[in-house]
Amino acid sequence: MKKSILITLMISLSLLIAACGNGNTASNNGNNEEANNDTSSTGTFTIGVIPAQTEGAMEGAMDKLQSILTDELGRDVEVEVYPDYNGVVEAMNYEKIDMAYFGPLSYVIANDKSGAKAIITQLIDGEPFYHSYIITHSDNPWNSLEELLENSQDVNFAFGDPNSTSGSLIPSIELQDRGVYQSDDEHEFASVRFTGSHDATALAVQNQQVEAGAIDSAIFNQLVESGKIDGEQIRTIWESDKLFQYPWAVHQNTDEETIEALQSAFLAIEDQEVLDAFGATGFTEASNEDYESIRQAALKQGLIEE
């Protein structure tokens, strides 16, 4: 009998200890959840940047931008230039970054894949627009795209990154409409290459490694103004219609307080090195609707689905 009572007491004590342990575990889980939430709002804020120019050309400016945003947001900010446009799209898709600097096309793709939300774009002389240029060396005889394409089989042509709007999407549609380009494997040129960035395309044309190339007008103008490219050696032979400028987009779950703080910080940026890295003169607010024309172009090319 005593033995039975002792066993009953031991079982009761074990259950009591287990219950207390579960209570502590629940409490600890709650604390961990709170800690995780705190980290999401005050931990390092990560920004991925497409290589609009080669990484070395952007490094100093990105360090400055990182410092500016760290001060304005009151939290650590880390800015990283990715080796290609698609890397930034995938980083947003897999939640490796909180914000991204996209080209219009890469933004449309990211919005389609992960719900990325445009909140800022850049200004060029007070306007949020730019163009796609097709350029050639001034030693060449062509003064227009029509003249260039008369003997397209003798032309080595350069695009930028495959996911660039002005360096690939828009000029490729123009060349398709003119019947000389379907893809990098099917075309009427001597060769087609992708340089990976706008400054690399400009240098390829200037150094006569290719006869013509597609480039962002704002970055081209900035390269000339900075002396990185000799404007006397380059001729623009085609210009697209206006394109809405490159967006800065956040993860779809970003809270409004953070969005407003980011918008305020970007609108206040006046540092010339930072602005020059993007070929910009300032920043302004943006929305998803600003990129509807690019979305339609991406649908036409089969880059996204309806």
Regions found by a protein language model. Give the residues of each.
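Ligand-binding clefts/hinges and TM-proximal coupling segments of bilobed small-molecule sensing domains
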Residues: 22-28, 150, 156-174, 261-306
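Short helices/loops that flank or line small-molecule/ion binding pockets
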Residues: 86-100, 113-114, 130, 150, ...
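A ligand-binding cleft/hinge motif common to bilobed small-molecule-binding domains
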Residues: 101-114, 172-177, 206-207, 211-231
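Periplasmic-binding protein-like
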Residues: 50-51, 123-133, 228-264, 276, ...
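A conserved helix-loop-strand patch within extracytoplasmic ligand-binding domains
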Residues: 123-180
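Extracytoplasmic "Venus flytrap"
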Residues: 36-62, 283
